[in-house]
Amino acid sequence: MEEPDSTSPPSSPAAAASPSPTLPRRKRRKKQFPGMIPLSRVRILRNPPSSSSSERPQPQQALLYDPPPPRSAAIRRRGRPPSSALRLSRDLDVEALIAAAAGFPIDSLTEEEIHDAVIPSLGGTAQVSYIAVRNHIVSRWRSDPSLWLTESQALESIRAEHHGLVVVAYSFLLRHGYINFGLAPAILSAPPRQPPSLPAPAVIIIGAGLAGLSAARHLLSLGFKVAVLEGRCRPGGRVYTKRMHSSSAEFPNVTAAVDLGGSVLTGINGNPLAVLARQLGLPLHKVRDICPLYLPDGRPVDSDIDDRMEATYNQILEKVCQLRQTVCDELGAAVDASLGTALEVFGKAHEIATSGEERMLFDWHLANLEYANAALLSDLSMVFWDQDDPYEMGGDHCFIPGGNGRFVHALAENIPIFYGRTVTSVNYGCDGVLVYSNTGQAFRGDMALCTVPLGVLKKGSIQFKPELPVKKQEAIKRLGFGLLNKVALLFPYTFWDSSRDTFGHLTENSNQRGEFFLFYSYTSVAGGPLLIALVAGESAIEFEKTPPKDCVEKCLEVLRKIFTPKGVQVPNPLESVCTRWGTDRFTHGSYSYVTVGASGDDYDILSESVGDGRLFFAGEATNRRYPATMHGAMLSGFREAANIEKTARKRAQKPSESGNDIEMVDVGDNDLDDLFRVADTSFGGFSVIYDPASPNESSASLVRVQIGGREPDSKSGFLYGLVSRNNVMELAVMDGDEERLSALDRDFGRKLVNRTSLGIEGEALIVRIKEARSRNNRNKEAANEV
């Protein structure tokens, strides 16, 4: 994000604080009901065993010996002690649950395992044994992720006849980033693996957010060469921890760390970010689930009405989900409607008042739902809006004291990142990739990984050559990219109840229900008087049209209405920050959601590589299971690093394919000097190179015009332009350069520019010329050898 708008009204002190929010008692997404997810829409890979269920092999056979007996026999329970088989079964159950938390099915294979052919055929004894081995390895490493788990250690508890499965499972888990990842010293000091080819393949990664950083670190561990291009001057992307400071002379040392973007670890069971926190020794703060609500005039909401309306809201949401199931069963998923429309219909059926406390409470829950999805309810798909719910990670929702920037900067350490490089175009083809930046530099590699937010793809900020497949373009259009904004307020002291992490605020106007509807206290996280106010739904859009100073004043007005009647004075903040994620040119929004007409399949389409394995995609909007989450972004980086490694291994088997160094091409005049030494035609001070990919008379040609004298000792320079072949022929017959220059502007509407201003079309033409000449040179060399 660009530097957020901030204001610093004069005031008094505060103490240090930290991070930002997720939802407590009023859960971030909603209450869960058994019938909420249409099972027909959930993809479950169950590989049928070759034998009947009664003959199905048991996973115990995969282990070599029983676990050791309890350390002490001092305490004994009545009755027969557990048998070895029972103890083993319990251990296997625990291992299966740990593996499930990490994203594995308890009794089946993942799609990646099937694609990697980890076993010769699906089903039967081999699959059951492999699953037990896989779960055992995952569980063993997760028990202490500060250590590097070796293959020999993984073999220790496994029978000799299953050692082959251990080798396969260990290799799969290592390549896909399920084990031995992260920032522990033992992990960082491990030598890189042998690359799939020599020289090692080079990968250009676009974006230094969590997806880009996790992919870069994992690819480096796999022996690849990596360069990360980042448009901002910092890592993290939408995960941004800002240090707020007091500008008051009276309280000069008051600071606080605030997460202005991604802030909450949404479920720590199996969460790779929780693993990073454990490796770095970072404590986790559970978000406490008591959330009092206040009316616009500051009075607390009546608890009976609050409970009744929360129950009503959940009943309505349940009925909407039952309707969805009926629609899917009878008409199929092709028939869709907005979640907002369905909620409105059932809300009327429940005779919810159009005004008063009940209506405001219902609106608060709707605002909460819009926050969870960063979307207007009118845009959300009724059928697929919560398609990721079956995969939600369990456990507490937590903050990292000091902010998520702590592990962002740890991830970025020693990664080759080029900051201030905004990618403008990506050319991908059989010879590799060429990635252009706004600085006039191009980066050449074997493959590229694009991790930019969906909002950037929707905006068309990056031009792809050739164009992305129509299927991917349509998925980019279908999926939504919503908006959530925040106001961060650093106060001189804590005037609210710091024993609670959240409190809510109701509005009288339904159209403004998302405006400052929820406040988060950071006091318990870092000890500083810091509040965050959330702005969701329609209000998040209007928020960005309002000057930051006015936004802060409105937020303070809300706080004063809540606390002044209690005799509590609300001071002016020492510093304030208003986010503007929607107008941030590096994001154009906050996170993805499923619109009407879209589905979870679109996340899968976005994740697909293009260009015969030259261009890959990662980011939260490419993760069907964990979209709109920080861990979803990180896991997508691991996923694509594994896919890149797999592609490189296949390519290495072809004799003509080998890795290249990452080449940074300075796009100055020098590269064009070489090209224009062999121009297709010249006249006066004009030199022309035609597009080698198109003989069409209307196709663009690259024109260079010498400005100044042509004598060796005269001062001169060059300007460039794109002119059609037809116009080139007209220029050639004109009388002198002065007439030609006039015709360029007057008749052809063409401007001459310097080398760095040729734009995407010009850079693409230069690439085609270079590639054509390179092919010609190779063909000549081959002919000479013959």
Named regions from a protein language model:
Residues 2-137, 163-175, 181, 185-189:
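Long, charge-rich, low-complexity intrinsically disordered regions
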Residues 155-163:
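Short helix-coil junctions and helix-kink-helix linkers
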Residues 299, 439-441, 710-711, 717, ...:
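Short acidic/polar mixed-charge low-complexity motifs
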Residues 138, 152-155:
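Amphipathic alpha-helical segments within well-ordered protein domains
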Residues 4, 36-48, 675-682, 686-692, ...:
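Intrinsically disordered, low-complexity segments
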Residues 688, 702-707, 720-722, 731-733:
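Short linear proline/tyrosine/threonine-rich motifs used for host-factor recruitment
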Residues 142-145:
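Short helix-capping/hinge SLiMs at alpha-helix to coil transitions
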Residues 82-112, 149-152, 169, 176-699, ...:
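FAD-dinucleotide binding site
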